[in-house]
Amino acid sequence: MASFKIVIVCLALLVAVASARRRDMMSDDELDYHYSKRGIPCACDSDGPDIRSASLSGIVWMGSCPSGWKKCKSYYSIVADCCNQ
């Protein structure tokens, strides 16, 4: 009887996994919009030395900059980079 229950549970899981819908892929424009809204603004080297009057044109990315973005801060950090497009 216990093996019958195990078979039923396994079949139910198989049906649930097989019928799961895949999420639609985002277009490049949607990805750019979401990338630009992600993260914390940071000051690039081109924004000037004064952080209070800087326009904060960069965005902090954990790890490294994604494709299409470039590192805009001169110092090196293992944890995060200040990137802009």
Curated annotation (Swiss-Prot):
<comment type="similarity">
    <text>Belongs to the sea anemone sodium channel inhibitory toxin family. Type II subfamily.</text>
</comment>
<keyword id="KW-0528">Neurotoxin</keyword>
<feature type="disulfide bond">
    <location>
        <begin position="65"/>
        <end position="83"/>
    </location>
</feature>
<keyword id="KW-0738">Voltage-gated sodium channel impairing toxin</keyword>
<feature type="signal peptide">
    <location>
        <begin position="1"/>
        <end position="20"/>
    </location>
</feature>
<keyword id="KW-0732">Signal</keyword>
<keyword id="KW-0872">Ion channel impairing toxin</keyword>
<keyword id="KW-0800">Toxin</keyword>
<comment type="function">
    <text>Binds to site 3 of voltage-gated sodium channels and inhibits the inactivation process. Is highly active on DmNav1/TipE (drosophila) and is only extremely weakly active on rat Nav1.4-beta-1/SCN4A-SCN1B, and on human Nav1.5-beta-1/SCN5A-beta-1. This reveals high specificity for arthropod over mammalian channels. In vivo, when released into the medium, this recombinant toxin induces impaired swimming, paralysis and death of the crustacean A.nauplii within several hours. Also causes paralysis of cherry shrimps immediately after injection at very low doses.</text>
</comment>
<dbReference type="GO" id="GO:0005576">
    <property type="term" value="C:extracellular region"/>
</dbReference>
<dbReference type="Pfam" id="PF00706">
    <property type="entry name" value="Toxin_4"/>
</dbReference>
<dbReference type="InterPro" id="IPR023355">
    <property type="entry name" value="Myo_ane_neurotoxin_sf"/>
</dbReference>
<feature type="propeptide">
    <location>
        <begin position="21"/>
        <end position="36"/>
    </location>
</feature>
<feature type="disulfide bond">
    <location>
        <begin position="44"/>
        <end position="72"/>
    </location>
</feature>
<keyword id="KW-1015">Disulfide bond</keyword>
<keyword id="KW-0964">Secreted</keyword>
<dbReference type="GO" id="GO:0090729">
    <property type="term" value="F:toxin activity"/>
</dbReference>
<keyword id="KW-0165">Cleavage on pair of basic residues</keyword>
<feature type="disulfide bond">
    <location>
        <begin position="42"/>
        <end position="82"/>
    </location>
</feature>
<protein>
    <recommendedName>
        <fullName>N.vectensis toxin 1 4</fullName>
    </recommendedName>
</protein>
<dbReference type="GO" id="GO:0017080">
    <property type="term" value="F:sodium channel regulator activity"/>
</dbReference>
